[in-house]
């Protein structure tokens, strides 16, 4: 569960390394984001020469959470870290590579480009 002020690692090569959540998109009183949800965040750490700079406000999709997600068959998927991928307005990733595994729930949210770029889909 990602909420306001949550810090996430960035799982792509857009140049950002860490994000701070500003808002969870989807409804007026929505408090938490899970895997496959879109957030508005600011870049807290960035690598030099990247596409995004420190202080930029970006949209991102959550790809890994420590709290995990429940599957329809009753099983749970959990990760060791909270991570997100920075996206454009058309839901395509800003970077050209995805690092680390991503959850299968992204396929249900129509993030097919992220799923195809990921080295492993769990």
Curated annotation (Swiss-Prot):
Gene3D superfamilies: Ribosomal protein L14. One of its GO terms (molecular function) is structural constituent of ribosome. PROSITE patterns: RIBOSOMAL_L14 (PS00049). Keywords: Ribonucleoprotein, Ribosomal protein, RNA-binding, rRNA-binding. InterPro entries: Ribosomal_uL14, Ribosomal_uL14_bac-type, Ribosomal_uL14_CS, Ribosomal_uL14_sf. It comes from the Bacteria. Transmembrane segments: none annotated. GO terms for biological process: translation. Pfam families: Ribosomal_L14 (PF00238). One of its GO terms (cellular component) is cytosolic large ribosomal subunit. Binds to 23S rRNA. Forms part of two intersubunit bridges in the 70S ribosome. PANTHER family: 50S/60S RIBOSOMAL PROTEIN L14/L23 (PTHR11761), LARGE RIBOSOMAL SUBUNIT PROTEIN UL14M (PTHR11761:SF3). NCBIfam families: rplN_bact. Belongs to the universal ribosomal protein uL14 family. Part of the 50S ribosomal subunit. Forms a cluster with proteins L3 and L19. In the 70S ribosome, L14 and L19 interact and together make contacts with the 16S rRNA in bridges B5 and B8. This is Large ribosomal subunit protein uL14. It comes from Bacillus cereus (strain ATCC 14579 / DSM 31 / CCUG 7414 / JCM 2152 / NBRC 15305 / NCIMB 9373 / NCTC 2599 / NRRL B-3711). The lineage of its organism: Bacteria, Bacillati, Bacillota, Bacilli, Bacillales. The gene is rplN.
């Amino acid at each position: 569960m990602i909420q306001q002020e949550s810090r996430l690692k960035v799982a792509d090569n857009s140049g950002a390394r860490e994000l701070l959540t500003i808002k969870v998109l989807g409804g007026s009183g929505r408090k938490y984001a899970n895997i496959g949800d879109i957030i508005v965040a600011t870049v807290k750490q960035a690598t030099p020469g990247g596409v995004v700079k420190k202080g930029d406000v970006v949209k991102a999709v959550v790809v890994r959470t420590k709290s995990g997600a429940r599957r329809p068959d009753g099983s749970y998927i959990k990760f060791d870290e909270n991570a997100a991928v920075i996206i454009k307005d058309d839901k395509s990733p800003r970077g050209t590579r995805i690092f680390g595994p991503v959850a299968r729930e992204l396929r249900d949210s129509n993030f097919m480009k992220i799923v195809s770029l990921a080295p492993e889909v769990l």
